A protein has these predicted regions:
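Short beta-strand and strand-turn-strand segments in soluble, beta-rich domains
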Residues: 2-17
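Beta-strand/loop edge motif enriched in small/polar residues
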Residues: 14-61, 65-265
């Protein structure tokens, strides 16, 4: 039995007979599936829809990527159903998202992490991302590292950390603008990104103002940043140390260092 469910012009089922399509008319066929990850041996679940008019049979292939993941969603008001927005520097914003809990401050390679809205790291906390981890962002989503918080991306040569959109079809593999940015806010400190791929967003990394620390706001090593609709890296009056990095194919500028700062590449 198939895990796919069909709905043909409002009628659910798996076997449909005598469906009339008038001249110059059409029908809607909706397909959905819910797959138990433990019941499949391959990450690709496949099936076919067969169309038969009695004289000719044709098939349409159905292919679904089945992958377990950790999902991070913003909260929602139980009465109005309005999605929660972040409060930054004590002021409400229109940025949909929430702060990560202490239990969520380590991303591993056991399961991908899928982020809806902005996942924020609160002051005096550190988000650690381990080798081989994959972070998928939904549309207009991203990461925010708040004042006095830190980001540690600890990829390796053979196990890079990947940041990209959550549309994994081949047609989206090089499409810019699928998600927002990794925003290192003013006052975030000692951020380190090593052996990462950051691709297909609006701004790969947005880095804000210099802190009183003698260490760079961001140390960026062995990292590829490409296919962003606006900037690969946008640095505003900040401090960056970069070694062995590739930044390219951005809509406005691959690297923009503005309003002064200290930059060593």
């Amino acid at each position: 039995s198939s895990n796919y469910r069909l709905n043909v012009d409002g009628i659910p089922g798996k076997d449909f007979q005598n469906i009339d399509i008038l001249a110059k008319d059409s029908i809607f066929i909706f397909v959905e599936t819910t797959v138990d990850i433990s019941s499949v041996s391959s990450p690709l679940y496949t099936d076919r829809i067969l169309f038969d008019n009695g004289m000719n049979q044709q098939g349409v292939e159905l292919i679904t990527l089945v992958q377990d993941a950790n999902f991070i969603y913003p909260g929602r008001d139980p009465f109005t159903l309005k999605i929660d927005s972040l409060t930054l520097d004590g002021e409400a914003t229109t940025i949909k998202g929430r702060f990560l809990t202490n239990e969520e401050l380590t991303f591993t390679n056991i399961k991908p992490t899928v982020i809806y809205g902005y996942a924020a790291v609160s002051s005096n906390s550190t988000l650690t991302i381990l080798p081989g981890a994959k972070v998928y962002f939904h549309d207009t989503s991203g990461l925010i590292i708040d004042k006095n918080a830190s980001l540690k991306v600890n990829g390796t040569l053979n196990e890079k950390v990947v940041f990209e959109g959550d549309r994994l079809e081949n047609s989206f593999s090089t499409l810019p603008g699928q998600w927002g940015t990794i925003w290192l806010r003013a006052g975030s400190k000692e951020n380190e990104i090593n052996y990462a791929q950051i691709k297909n967003g609006s701004i790969g990394i947005l880095v804000d103002s210099i802190t009183s620390s003698t260490s760079p706001t961001l140390t960026l090593k062995n990292t590829e940043i490409f296919n962003h609709s606006n900037f690969g890296v946008l640095a505003r009056e900040t401090s960056i140390l970069g070694e062995n990095i590739v930044i390219g194919n951005a809509g406005e500028a691959s690297l923009a260092c503005v309003i002064g700062g200290s930059y060593n590449f």
